[in-house]
Amino acid sequence: METEQPEETFPNTETNGEFGKRPAEDMEEEQAFKRSRNTDEMVELRILLQSKNAGAVIGKGGKNIKALRTDYNASVSVPDSSGPERILSISADIETIGEILKKIIPTLEEGLQLPSPTATSQLPLESDAVECLNYQHYKGSDFDCELRLLIHQSLAGGIIGVKGAKIKELRENTQTTIKLFQECCPHSTDRVVLIGGKPDRVVECIKIILDLISESPIKGRAQPYDPNFYDETYDYGGFTMMFDDRRGRPVGFPMRGRGGFDRMPPGRGGRPMPPSRRDYDDMSPRRGPPPPPPGRGGRGGSRARNLPLPPPPPPRGGDLMAYDRRGRPGDRYDGMVGFSADETWDSAIDTWSPSEWQMAYEPQGGSGYDYSYAGGRGSYGDLGGPIITTQVTIPKDLAGSIIGKGGQRIKQIRHESGASIKIDEPLEGSEDRIITITGTQDQIQNAQYLLQNSVKQYADVEGF
């Protein structure tokens, strides 16, 4: 639905020589990266936007979007949504799409830019946010920007190439940063390709990617992302939500961490809510092959994040971790980290080292939770060493001490550890929640240590 938005117009690129022309050496570089596109072929581009940026594209009374449709003879739409994200859809030939993007990019702004937390700093709050990056402040195209391209998951391999060769070539030839997120958008088969750099180069990169994927047929089921099913528990590279208490409305900003916290999107009048993540997992096309047998964990890939999460297999015939209702460990550890029956949760974990935390939370043999598969290659080469996955369980009453207000605490743990951390909702009738940690061995160990400290520091203080 196109609603009336504050007046905002596109820059006149015809009178702005800086934006319309590129140095000869740039053109030579592009020629070195040859493309064999049919310039008349119609393709569809879908860009993930912050909801607040829809007004810049639509314009007051739909003025801007109507001008784009008329001037470029293209199909341009920004469907409404109830969350912090919307999708800009453009259907035209590739060259025309590039020109439309050059019109749109200077009108956008990036969301709240939070200071990066450090190991010793407090968690940043919205009041600490610096000024939004508004691309309209710049003249010409000499500024850095980011766009999030949506592609079907089956097309990712064509962008990455053999051992990452294609994506490396793209980065070098277009002088952009490219990150292909591994996890699909919530309840969809779409993945996010985050492209950053100067506007002209970002647009050129997108044109090349469109050319690459236009030659490849989509394989498998196609379920385009619907932003109304926005869910921060998915680490897909979209935008997260922060509520502006002064206005009582959600404010979107880029996900700079590695995921989100457990929170389902608010319902929308008359619109059915998506099934729970666990239910949806059963029909996900990304389930991959069955997990390898114990002791033969895969290497080189990340476990299919949308796999149905099994109950933790008991190491050596016992429970992975036993708790009482106050969140204290019980007395069954089967040779792992031992505690006396009267030892409290706080006194126990006070003395844990990272290695002891890891021992207590990982099954003996080291691979019982390492359900890896080779299909997940997003973030190719971003991390050193094999990517593994570990699952731990905590009483659901303690989850708040890890998540924190607005999810800020878990975001900081992700940021500091570099690991992907997901906290599942408890199963029906269960008093526990499963935490899935994905990353290198060092990242997982750091994450476990930070989780330990968070529970120790906040469980009693906040009354969990």
Curated annotation (Swiss-Prot):
Residues 19-37, 276-285 have a biased composition (Basic and acidic residues). Sumoylated by CBX4. Sumoylation is increased upon DNA damage, such as that produced by doxorubicin, etoposide, UV light and camptothecin, due to enhanced CBX4 phosphorylation by HIPK2 under these conditions. Ubiquitinated by MDM2. Doxorubicin treatment does not affect monoubiquitination, but slightly decreases HNRNPK poly-ubiquitination. CDD domains: KH-I_HNRNPK_rpt1, KH-I_HNRNPK_rpt2, KH-I_HNRNPK_rpt3. The modification Omega-N-methylarginine is found at R316, R377. The modification N6-succinyllysine is found at K219. Residues 1-37, 250-329 are annotated as: Disordered. There is a cross-link at K34, K163, K422 (Glycyl lysine isopeptide (Lys-Gly) (interchain with G-Cter in SUMO1)). One of the major pre-mRNA-binding proteins. Binds tenaciously to poly(C) sequences. Likely to play a role in the nuclear metabolism of hnRNAs, particularly for pre-mRNAs that contain cytidine-rich sequences. Can also bind poly(C) single-stranded DNA. Plays an important role in p53/TP53 response to DNA damage, acting at the level of both transcription activation and repression. When sumoylated, acts as a transcriptional coactivator of p53/TP53, playing a role in p21/CDKN1A and 14-3-3 sigma/SFN induction. This is Heterogeneous nuclear ribonucleoprotein K. It comes from Macaca fascicularis. The modification Phosphothreonine is found at T39. There is a cross-link at K34, K52, K60, K163, K219, K405, K422 (Glycyl lysine isopeptide (Lys-Gly) (interchain with G-Cter in SUMO2)).
